[in-house]
Amino acid sequence: MMKKNRWFWLVAIIGLGLDQLTKYITVQSFETIGDTFGLWPGVFHLTYVINTGAAFSFFKGGAVWLRWLSLAVSLGLIFLGWYAPRMRIVEQLGYGFILAGALGNGIDRFLFGYVVDFLDFRLINFPVFNLADTFINIGIFFLLLASFPPKSSSQKNTSQ
């Protein structure tokens, strides 16, 4: 069954691994919450923060219901990847990235009650975020691409 939507599973597993690894490295590398390291001072820093809300600290303090939302989304996507007919590659990538992000942040919420964030773009004063947040946005982008119908072979021939 996993062969059917292999890009979905591959992206989800690798993405989840990268997300959890980078969060672990962040926690082990910084002594206290709020510590920062400027990779490109004033532009991009690694900053250790915890987030009890959703992406960009929306719904701050909503960890209880957010953990269940993460679980529901994750289970729904696992069900989709396992039982749905073979998806187009762009759909597999989209759903796989979203699953990686939902699982990554969901694991944190269930284990710790918060999510570890560390990617800090200061040039544009953007909220600190993590790879799971990035993966969810990449997944949405792929699903938006997938929403455009593929060109049929007759359309391809007439546009040349």
Curated annotation (Swiss-Prot):
Function recorded in the entry: This protein specifically catalyzes the removal of signal peptides from prolipoproteins.
Family: Belongs to the peptidase A8 family.
Protein keywords: Aspartyl protease, Cell inner membrane, Cell membrane, Hydrolase, Membrane, Protease, Transmembrane, Transmembrane helix
GO biological process, one term: proteolysis
Keyword Hydrolase: yes
Cell membrane recorded as keyword: yes
CC per GO annotation: plasma membrane
Localization per Swiss-Prot or TrEMBL: Cell inner membrane
Tree of life domain: Bacteria
Reactions catalysed, as given in the entry: Release of signal peptides from bacterial membrane prolipoproteins. Hydrolyzes -Xaa-Yaa-Zaa-|-(S,diacylglyceryl)Cys-, in which Xaa is hydrophobic (preferably Leu), and Yaa (Ala or Ser) and Zaa (Gly or Ala) have small, neutral side chains
Transmembrane domains' residue ranges: 7-27, 39-59, 62-82, 96-116, 126-146
Family annotation (Pfam families): Peptidase_A8
Pathway recorded for this protein: Protein modification; lipoprotein biosynthesis (signal peptide cleavage)
Annotated InterPro entries: Peptidase_A8 (IPR001872)
Coiled coil (UniProt feature): none
EC number from the UniProt entry: 3.4.23.36
Active site per the UniProt annotation: 117, 133
Signal peptide stretch: none
GO molecular function, one term: aspartic-type endopeptidase activity
Membrane topology: Multi-pass membrane protein
Lineage of producing organism: Bacteria, Bacillati, Cyanobacteriota, Cyanophyceae, Oscillatoriophycideae
Protein name, per record: Lipoprotein signal peptidase
Main location: membrane
